[in-house]
């Protein structure tokens, strides 16, 4: 299916996989998929680049304001009221991430999005030795999967998916995370043993019942558009969804957009488990 959509991905047996990542533990290694065109991006730098370009195109940013209410009249959006003022607009996009449900309720509606805590960490910089991101989708004690990669600065960035999920807004680091992820990482790449960890942190994923985003118009309030529940894939999905939302809000949908919106409809029947990891 991935190849049918143009993705360059292939299965490599253990011997060929070790040619790509020589430092993998060979004992018990069967193989894995490899996508040479994959990469990573700095969320901070990417966000700032989008911010600067948006300003060049005339976008106005208001930082440090909390939306208290989505204003409506006659079943249609009129704008938003914040703790610092009122802004009138014919359309409001709910893209509030883990706070999506809170904002939806400020509009008198609801969305099935809950915040899910995930922890990550970063090491000291070391000489370059790792090219692709390593993703281990095998479940382990306390975790569903984990990944790590080497940043261009030489630091190793790593994250784990807790199992069961930790629902809530607690962003405090835990004492369980580092020992758990270290055991798993060293199990497949012993070379990491002596690298020092600089810091860990905890953030929130906005999760939906089936692990796919909720994108489309709100039926209960005309002019309210939903772009919520990216489930940890927001940075990857953002550019494409941003263009789709622009076309949706301005009534300029292209062929194929309606099929995408149907698949991501906030009103779809939720079945199965999370598909995106």
Residue ranges and their predicted role:
Residues 1-20, 145-146, 166-167, 176, ...:
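Dinucleotide-binding Rossmann-like beta1-alpha1 core, especially the glycine-rich loop
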């Amino acid at each position: 299916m991935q190849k049918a959509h143009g993705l360059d991905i292939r299965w490599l047996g253990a011997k060929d996989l070790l040619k790509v990542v020589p430092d993998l533990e060979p004992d018990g290694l069967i193989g894995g998929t490899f996508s040479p065109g994959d990469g990573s991006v700095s969320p901070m730098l990417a966000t700032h680049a989008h911010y600067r370009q948006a300003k060049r195109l005339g976008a106005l940013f208001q930082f440090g304001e909390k939306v208290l209410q989505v204003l409506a009249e006659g079943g249609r959006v009129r704008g938003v009221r914040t703790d610092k003022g009122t802004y009138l607009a014919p359309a409001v996009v709910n893209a509030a991430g883990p706070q999506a449900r809170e904002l939806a309720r400020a509009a008198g509606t609801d969305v099935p999005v809950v915040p899910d805590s995930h922890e990550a960490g970063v090491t000291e910089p070391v000489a370059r030795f790792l090219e692709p991101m390593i993703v281990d989708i095998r479940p382990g004690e306390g975790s569903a999967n984990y990944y790590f990669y080497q940043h261009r600065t030489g630091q190793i960035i790593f994250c784990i998916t807790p199992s069961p999920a930790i629902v809530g807004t607690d962003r405090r680091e835990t004492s369980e995370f580092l020992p758990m992820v270290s055991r798993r990482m060293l199990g497949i790449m012993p070379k990491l043993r002596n690298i020092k960890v600089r810091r860990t942190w905890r953030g929130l994923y906005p999760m939906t019942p089936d692990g796919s985003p909720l994108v489309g118009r709100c039926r209960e309030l005309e002019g309210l558009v939903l772009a919520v529940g990216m489930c940890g894939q927001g940075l990857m999905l953002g550019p494409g969804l941003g263009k789709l939302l622009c076309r949706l809000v301005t009534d300029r949908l292209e062929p194929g957009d309606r099929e995408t919106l149907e698949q991501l409809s906030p009103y779809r029947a939720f079945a199965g488990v999370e598909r995106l990891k």
